[in-house]
From Swiss-Prot:
Name this polypeptide is given: DNA ligase
Catalysed reaction equations from the record: NAD(+) + (deoxyribonucleotide)n-3'-hydroxyl + 5'-phospho-(deoxyribonucleotide)m = (deoxyribonucleotide)n+m + AMP + beta-nicotinamide D-nucleotide
Organism: Aliivibrio salmonicida (strain LFI1238) (Vibrio salmonicida (strain LFI1238))
Gene Ontology terms, MF aspect: DNA binding; DNA ligase (NAD+) activity; metal ion binding
Stretches assigned to the BRCT domain: 591-669
Gene name in the database record: ligA
GO biological process assignments: DNA repair; DNA replication
Annotated residues for binding of NAD(+): 31-35, 80-81, 112, 135, 172, 289, 313
Length: 669
């Protein structure tokens, strides 16, 4: 293909996807793919300037205005930003600006997170908000004044004094993660299609023709620059302008800071990247700006972006790949999970070849076929998932995904209980797949913690029909274990020793090891502390069970069902006959004041000085109820390093947040 034809095809594709992104709010490509196409276009135009045209996507920003809104003209164009994708490109940015300044050099930068929302312009005249517009194509946007007036954090009248007669504030409208989750939860309850991501939700909410709908959406706003300034002056520092705007009532991102060198900028980037998942909003990089306004003016602009700013993008969290097949896996409780087998793709810092498809409803919602090009997303430690399908790229030989009616492991009939989204194999431990997963759970670190008995060993034990129930594990001898692959006499004896050591456990660990549906570590600990004996738990009524913290109607029914099953009773009896035991739990002395009595607390993140289980036990001794998730009933969140979505939700709900040092101080006192 000739260079001209390549350029034409790139322009056509970029224009099409810009329209899908900016106008229809229904992007088909992940941002990283669009960025790559744009970088390819820029490179070709740089090498062959004779082929550059005025209608090239490199010469404009965004898309056309929607027909449903009146238009606003931007007196000062609302431009986009050039991107950097690595440290070398950031170094080149610094060199470019310093080479252009010649006599001056940049010694101060203003850095802020790059919010993933919708750029807007707010015009204040005599302190009153008179107009709000989208960026549109940079020169012309959509008049969204009535919708913006519904966003509570945007002042309709500026506070304080000293603001210019005409002041244009530019910033990003976005939807916080917690608000996005709540919005989608409501949509699902009403059987409506949920939004794909917070950016789409923010854009869709802001572009409602009925502002009453916008008013119901949890939108927020951060200022990031100014445009028109008439009848007054602002500070000569970009950062200090943020402070001015904040004093006048306009929100400023709390992560904005000044950096005194490019080394500081790189450290800032790394810090924000590491804390990305804990922030209460979606970001896709950081924006670095020359802090001095006079130097900004000297540097000026190119056609589509300022020379004095750059967006340092994070590694892509979304990428395009192909769905090659779907494998149906059987979990410990019989749940059938469809797993997408993908063409390997590097995304979110790792190579991904598998992704969850959750259940039959999710497959139907996505409308995905084997052979489809799909958008895969991996954020933080979240399991990779398919978020959408590029239907325009569907091949003619694509195949619909057929959900199984019988168990792929034991051929038993599958069942789906009314009101549940999960399809299950109800064969229990008769099913080899469930048996494997149940035994893996039983010996896991948070359960009986049997060192040396890993997943591969458990799978061999089941495949060779050496073990059927958890009690059978304690009948194994070193001699028997040596028949397994890669299991020598010394390793075999170590496993036997670990099994004997695991017999001495705690009631909460034992309860957790049994694999009762929806009974996690925290719930098991709360049950043990509340009832104090296994007999009391197994004979508890529904009414008694729901008195326990973290135990609702559904969990109570699972517990009742588990202990009423004769097979489960036999498993517990055999385990005790094999010597599995635990110390008695001492009842709390109610005469002694409990500093955290009836407080609902949650632990999240990495603790360096405390073991998580020890911290939980100590908190419970102080009267706290340790929950597994943050809700409006949570009193305190103890957040370690790299705390993620729980921290964001706690901040959104106004929950008290303490760090590990404060936790240790409470425990010591």
């Amino acid at each position: 293909m000739s260079i001209e034809k390549t350029l034409d095809e790139l322009k056509k594709q970029l224009n099409y996807h810009a329209y899908r992104y900016y106008v229809e709010d229904s992007p088909e490509l992940p941002d990283a793919e669009y960025d790559r196409m744009m970088q390819q276009l820029l490179l070709i135009e740089k090498e062959h300037p004779e082929f550059m045209t005025v209608d090239s996507p490199s010469q404009r920003v965004g898309g056309e205005a929607l027909g449903g809104f009146t238009q606003v003209q931007h007196e000062i164009p609302m431009l986009s930003l050039d991107n950097a994708f690595n440290d070398n490109e950031l170094d080149s940015f610094e060199k470019r600006i310093n080479d252009r300044l010649i006599s001056d050099s940049v010694s101060l930068f203003c850095c802020e997170p790059k919010l993933d929302g919708l750029a807007v312009s707010l015009l204040y005249v005599d302190g009153l908000l008179v107009q709000a517009g989208t960026r549109g194509d940079g020169a012309t946007g959509e008049n969204i004044t009535e919708n913006v007036r519904t966003i509570r954090c945007i002042p309709l009248t500026l506070q304080g004094e000293g603001w210019p007669t005409r002041l244009e504030v530019r910033g990003e409208v976005f939807m916080p993660k917690a608000g996005f989750d709540a919005l989608n939860e409501r949509a699902l309850k009403r059987a409506e299609k949920p939004f794909a991501n917070p950016r789409n939700a923010a854009a869709g909410s802001l572009r409602q023709l009925d502002s009453k709908i916008t008013a119901t959406r949890p939108l927020s706003f951060y200022a990031y620059s100014v445009g028109i300034i008439e009848g007054g002056e602002l500070e000569g520092s970009h950062y200090q302008r943020f402070v001015q705007l904040k004093n006048w009532g306009l929100p400023m991102c709390e992560e904005t800071k000044q950096c005194h060198s490019l080394t500081d900028v790189k450290a800032y980037y790394k810090d924000i990247l590491e804390r990305r998942d804990a922030l209460k909003y979606e970001i896709d990089g950081v924006v670095i700006k020359v802090d001095s306004i006079s130097l900004q003016e000297q540097l000026g602009f190119v056609a589509r972006a300022p020379r004095w700013a750059i967006a340092y993008k994070f590694p892509a969290q979304e990428e395009l790949t192909v769905l090659n097949d779907v494998e149906f896996q059987v979990g410990r409780t019989g749940a059938i999970t469809p797993v997408a087998k993908l063409e390997p793709i590097f995304v979110g810092g790792v190579t991904v070849s598998n992704a969850t498809l959750h259940n039959a409803d999710e497959i139907a919602r996505l409308g995905v076929h084997i052979g489809d090009t799909v958008i895969i997303r991996r954020a933080g430690d979240v399991i990779p998932q398919i978020v959408s399908v590029v239907e325009a790229r569907r091949p003619e030989d694509s195949k619909a995904i057929i959900y199984p009616t019988t168990c792929p492991a034991c051929d038993s009939q599958l069942e789906r209980i009314e009101g549940e989204v999960v399809t299950r194999c109800v064969a229990g431990l008769v099913c080899p797949a469930q048996r494997k997963e149940a035994l893996k759970h039983f010996v896991s670190r948070k359960a009986l913690d049997v060192d040396g008995l890993g997943d591969k060993v458990v799978e061999q034990l089941v495949d060779k029909e050496m073990v059927e129930t958890p009690a059978d594990l304690f009948k194994l001898s070193a001699g028997v274990l040596t028949v397994l692959d890669r299991m020598g006499p010394k390793s075999a004896q170590n496993v036997v020793n670990a099994l004997n050591k695991a017999k001495e456990t705690t009631l909460s660990r034992f309860l957790y090891s049994l694999g009762i549906r929806e009974v996690g570590e925290a719930t098991a600990a709360n049950l043990a502390l509340h009832f104090q004996t296994l007999n009391a738990i197994s004979s508890a009524t529904f009414e008694q069970l729901i008195e326990v913290s973290d135990v609702g109607d559904i969990v109570a029914k699972h517990i009742l069902g588990f202990f009423s099953e004769p097979h489960n009773q036999a498993v517990i009896e055999n385990l005790q006959l094999m010597g599995v035991n635990w110390p008695d739990i001492k009842a709390l002395d109610e005469s002694v004041p409990q500093p955290l009595a009836d407080k609902v607390v949650v632990l999240t993140g990495t603790l360096y000085k405390l073991k998580r289980n020890e911290a939980k036990a100590a908190l419970q001794e102080l009267g706290a109820k340790v929950a597994g998730s943050v809700s409006k009933n949570t009193d305190i969140l103890f957040a370690g390093e790299a705390a993620g979505s729980k921290l964001a939700k706690a901040e959104e709900l106004g929950v008290e947040i303490m760090n590990e040092e404060q936790l240790i101080e409470i425990l010591n006192n």
